[in-house]
């Protein structure tokens, strides 16, 4: 999957860019 390497806080997958998902530590990855 395509996920820009930008540190972004999130609560759910839709908070993240491209195909990133929200990981357990609260950041996109």
From Swiss-Prot:
It comes from the Eukaryota. PROSITE patterns: SQUASH_INHIBITOR. One of its GO terms (molecular function) is serine-type endopeptidase inhibitor activity. The keyword Chloroplast does not apply. Disulfide bonds join 3-20, 10-22, 16-28. The record marks 5-6 as: Reactive bond. Its main location: secreted. Keywords: Disulfide bond, Knottin, Protease inhibitor, Secreted, Serine protease inhibitor. GO terms for cellular component: extracellular region. It is found in: Secreted. Belongs to the protease inhibitor I7 (squash-type serine protease inhibitor) family. The presence of a 'disulfide through disulfide knot' structurally defines this protein as a knottin. Inhibits trypsin. This is Trypsin inhibitor 1. It comes from Cucurbita maxima (Pumpkin).
